[in-house]
Amino acid sequence: MLKADETGDGWPKGPEIKGDGAVVVDADTGNILFEKNMYEQFYPASTTKILTTLVALENGNLDDVLTVSYAADNYVSKTSSRMGLTEGEQVTVEQALYGIMLESGNEATYAVGEHVGKSIAGFIKLMNRKAKELGCERSHFANSHGLHDEDHYTCCYDLSLIARAAYQNPEFMKITGTAFYNMPATNKHEAKILTNHHWFLNGTQKYEYATGGKTGATTQAGYALVTYARKDGKNLISVVMHAPTWDDVYADSRKLLDYCFDHFVSYRMDEIGRDELRFPSCFDYSPAFPDQEDPIVKISGSGTIIIPDGFDISKAKKTITYDTSFELEHGDNRIGKITYTYGSRTIGDTDIVLYNAAYPLTKKVYEECWPSYMIPVDVVFADVDPELLGKPGEKEESLRKSRLLKENALAIGIGAGVSVFIVGGVIALIARKLRKRRRR
């Protein structure tokens, strides 16, 4: 039974779970659909290996052949989870990564870390650097495998950031979504089959929408589970930490994924339609920008708004931010962003785009047909080589005016258009879609 949020704002609370911490995010947008103690720190156990694999993919070469060192074989507990590598064994980085993500091979993480990071200490530095780049503020990693260390911790939110970054790497998703991997023979062992330990991909608790994930368990960490799932075009990532048992962590994850799939709806801006994505600006009527098949200023069609089913979108708050630091290029130039929030929750965003499809007319033609009280002609043509303007030696002034053009484009071209059209228009379009959906 779904309950309303304790704040009374109508946002659904979601199911009760036994894990002490959890979060579900939309994998494509990063929007948070459910959370429980998502900033509380826990030990991640083997869910650490998501970061290990991501760092190896970004910094290593899958075809490299590594040799398992004495340290990799012996400095990791022989009774912990392993893929079966021994000292002197030679495997490719790719084979080791399958062993890490499927069999949770601790010795494989050490071997990969030594190879990719030049030393295990160097690799751990790469792990912490990557976590920081992703915005993980409550995490620190002391090893590559996740076996207990007091200085090795994270939280559900940070782990979701790591999992989402990994989701954006196609090779990672290929590995984590593999149920069985045929490991070829090596110089030490015969060929064998590696089996994914995630029960949603294999075993009696198979979940039909699961596309990957990682398990984790130690005495101190309890039971942790990260799951990737896809249903009806929605891609979700669930993170559950510090659950009492394996059965509990899988039951929690299934509940959360089913809840979010069934009670949230998403709308992509490109579902609205091309004409409704554009809005007027003074550039549409400028003779300096002739024959524009696309609008000069528009919103990106790739943005997505995600809300609970039946939610009143008109209650959302709209925030517009502009970016004047860009360098104009042909094609789409991101010049701002619209963010939709509900309370403290971000429910969607989309980019404001300046479309630079072609060079303007010549300065001479522009002067003849464009009123002088509009944008100054020298500002419009500030990106043109000064020598072509007949004013050699004024390159610095031209560059200054080029920057001014960008600021004018923002202030004149989209200042009113964005506020009037997008802020009200997109809300109205989504509201109309919701009404149609409810009538069905």
Model feature map: region roles:
Residues 1-157, 161-175:
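Active-site-adjacent loops and short helices of periplasmic peptidoglycan-processing enzymes
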Residues 30, 54-57, 338, 391-395, ...:
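Polar low-complexity intrinsically disordered regions
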